[in-house]
């Protein structure tokens, strides 16, 4: 019996060889405890309840701008990988106060992935 394999619309992938970009758009305290400094919050859900709104916003925006960037996508490609997994939160569009959406960062990731010939696996991770 022969089985068919899926080939991406723009890429010829026989195997997914990738890396997880966790803690970028969905915070994981165990991966970067510094984001939770000054709080007793254990996860992103409780973090904004324990920080001044301006501090929370600045911390999140700085983290998202610096934690993963285009250089990382170039490096991933140079390692011979062809895919990245990006966990995203349910508030990706920014419609759930006090959380800050991250659709702009995901859009950048798609542009970088296209530039470096990578595919993206989006994982709703909430």
Give the positions of each predicted feature.
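N-terminal carbohydrate-binding accessory modules
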Residues: 1-81
């Amino acid at each position: 019996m022969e089985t068919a394999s899926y080939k991406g619309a723009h890429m010829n992938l026989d195997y997914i060889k990738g890396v997880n970009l966790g803690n970028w758009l969905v915070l994981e305290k165990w991966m970067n405890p510094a984001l939770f400094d000054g709080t007793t919050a254990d996860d992103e859900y409780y973090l904004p309840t324990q920080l001044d709104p301006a501090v929370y916003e600045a911390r999140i925006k700085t983290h998202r701008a610096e934690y993963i960037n285009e250089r990382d996508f170039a490096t991933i490609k140079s390692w011979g990988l062809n895919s990245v997994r990006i966990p995203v939160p349910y508030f990706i569009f920014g419609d759930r106060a006090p959380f800050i959406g991250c659709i702009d960062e995901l859009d950048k990731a798609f542009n970088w992935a296209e530039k470096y010939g990578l595919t993206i696996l989006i994982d709703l991770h909430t």
